[in-house]
UniProtKB/Swiss-Prot annotation:
Family: Belongs to the bacterial ring-hydroxylating dioxygenase alpha subunit family.
Chemical reaction(s) catalysed: biphenyl + NADH + O2 + H(+) = (2R,3S)-3-phenylcyclohexa-3,5-diene-1,2-diol + NAD(+)
Quaternary structure note: Heterohexamer consisting of three BphA1 subunits and three BphA2 subunits. The multicomponent biphenyl dioxygenase system is composed of a ferredoxin reductase (BphA4), a ferredoxin (BphA3), and a terminal oxygenase (BphA1A2).
Cofactor binding notes: Binds 1 [2Fe-2S] cluster per subunit. Binds 1 Fe cation per subunit.
Designated name of the protein: Biphenyl 2,3-dioxygenase subunit alpha
Enzyme Commission number(s) of this protein: 1.14.12.18
PROSITE patterns for this protein: RIESKE (PS51296), RING_HYDROXYL_ALPHA (PS00570)
Gene Ontology MF term list: 2 iron, 2 sulfur cluster binding; biphenyl 2,3-dioxygenase activity; iron ion binding; monooxygenase activity
Residues annotated to bind substrate: 217-230
Source species: Rhodococcus jostii (strain RHA1)
Occurrences of domain Rieske (ranges): 56-165
Residues the record lists as binding Fe cation: 224, 230, 378
């Protein structure tokens, strides 16, 4: 027996958007965004299929499931999945759905198991997702081919400890998908030969906003950090003896837009005072001076990359975001067009002193967590925007995303990709351009045809 694809019922759903109409929602040339991309239910349904159904999505960190049988549950879009370490050390990701009536195979957040049994009718699966036992099989299901009734398996690949999964067999491998973005990810993931480890625990909370607001901010928006958005958190975190006048936003920095793919990042260069106000003196000293920082400079190829990049933000399209230096990593799981579920954890250098690991844990809880002082600022802004967009007139005029238009460098000797000033929306335009590409391309062959005919940078 072979699987048959079942089309979802369309009753009560709005008709799909035509590709030509989707293409008009984002104007990269002028930096205009149609607000309906954040609210339209039909667009969201197409996102689940065309973006979340064929992008590489963050599943977690390898150290969260170190032993055979270790597992954690997660999501790919709105599809629940299981992430399981196998006996041979590999990791499998499969749909957390029993093939009998669609119940979750596993309802726990994580743990260690030798098998998984559906709580509805007792169908049992091994840690690889293979159906191994069916109650009353001989009497009730004579001739059942159990090998045909395992859950849908995803592709799994890792990059320096981070686990990613993809439903699409035709998607490029993870290394190709990340491209030059790996250069910027390494500022957090490759500071030491020991790599990174995840601090135990995942924080989860809900924000009533569209996923693209969160992804875009971490991709492109240092602008809000340099104005008034986080002023209260900065004031609350000022170390003793430091005056606010000493913490004027740095003026030197860059923003990175992926040549292709929608990834983006940005950071200040040189001035550590903003990091000091966010993470305190212990983390700032660890990041900027001493043996660990010097080792990072050697591995990353320059003192600037190892010790002088501050307050970096980054998004791997579509929904994997992180803040090197602060070291929070999160996935923005969509829950309809008007809500996200945030899953966040913290990584540290695996060979960092235990007291530094504890300092990172405490500081990320204070700053970027469900109750973090900076997290609250961001969430409040996104929620308020989403509420305003309930109005008809509020959705009737385009948003302005033209900051930094025409002010880019695609041949920077130190940093790969398209480079602009730190206060820019170049990376945001890249994210939304990739959104249009994926929403209007029928398959990965069509997507690959949109790649620029240039070789990838050789920066290391």
């Amino acid at each position: 027996m072979t699987d048959v694809q079942c089309e979802p019922a369309l009753a009560g759903r709005k008709p799909k958007w035509a590709d030509a109409d989707i293409a008009e929602l984002v104007d990269e040339r002028t930096g205009r965004l149609d607000p309906r991309i954040y609210t339209d239910e039909a667009l969201y349904e197409q996102e689940l299929e065309r973006i979340f159904g064929r992008s590489w999505l963050l599943m977690g960190h390898e150290t969260q499931i170190p032993k055979a049988g270790d597992f954690m549950t997660n999501y790919m879009g709105e599809d629940p999945v299981m992430v399981v370490r196998q006996k041979n050390g590999e990791i499998r990701v499969f749909l957390n759905q029993c093939r009998h009536r669609g119940m979750r195979i596993c309802r726990a957040d994580g743990g260690n198991a030798k098998s998984f049994t559906c709580s509805y009718h007792g169908w049992a699966y091994d840690t690889g997702g293979n159906l191994v036992s069916v109650p009353f099989e001989e009497q009730a299901f004579p001739g059942l081919r159990k090998e045909d009734w395992g859950p849908l398996q995803a592709r799994v690949e890792t990059y320096k400890g981070l686990i990613f999964a993809n439903w699409d067999a035709d998607a490029p491998d993870l290394d190709t998908y990340l491209g030059e973005a790996k250069f910027y990810m390494d500022h957090m993931l490759d500071r030491t030969e020991a790599g990174t480890e995840a601090i135990p625990g995942i924080q989860k909370w809900v924000i009533p906003c569209n996923w693209k607001f969160a992804a875009e901010q971490f991709c492109s928006d240092m602008y809000h950090a340099g104005t008034t958005s986080h002023l209260s958190g900065i004031l609350a975190g000022l170390p003793d003896g430091v005056d606010l006048s000493e913490l004027a936003p740095p003026t030197e920095g860059i923003q990175y837009r992926a040549t292709w793919g929608g990834h983006g990042s940005g950071f200040y260069i040189g001035d550590p005072n903003l990091l000091l106000a966010i993470m305190g003196p212990k983390v700032t000293e660890y990041w900027t001076q001493g043996p660990a920082a010097e080792k990072a400079s050697e591995r990353l190829g320059s003192t600037e990359r190892g010790q002088q990049l501050m307050a970096q933000h980054m998004t791997i399209f579509p929904t994997c975001s992180f803040l090197p230096g602060i070291n929070t990593i999160r996935a923005w799981h969509p829950r309809g067009p008007n809500e996200i579920e945030v899953w966040a954890f913290t990584v540290v250098d695996a060979d960092a002193p235990e007291e530094m690991k504890e300092e990172y844990r405490q500081q990320t809880l204070r700053t970027f967590s469900a109750g973090g002082v900076f997290e609250q600022d961001d969430g409040e802004n996104w929620v308020e925007i989403q509420q305003v967009l309930r109005g008809h007139k509020a959705r009737s005029r385009p948003f302005n995303a033209e900051m930094g238009l025409g002010q880019t460098d695609s041949d920077n000797p130190d940093y790969p990709g398209t480079i602009s000033y730190v206060y820019s929306e170049e990376a945001a335009r890249g994210l939304y351009t990739q959104w249009v590409r994926m929403m209007t391309s029928p398959d990965w062959a069509a997507l690959d045809a949109t790649r620029p005919a240039v070789s990838e940078s050789t920066h290391t």
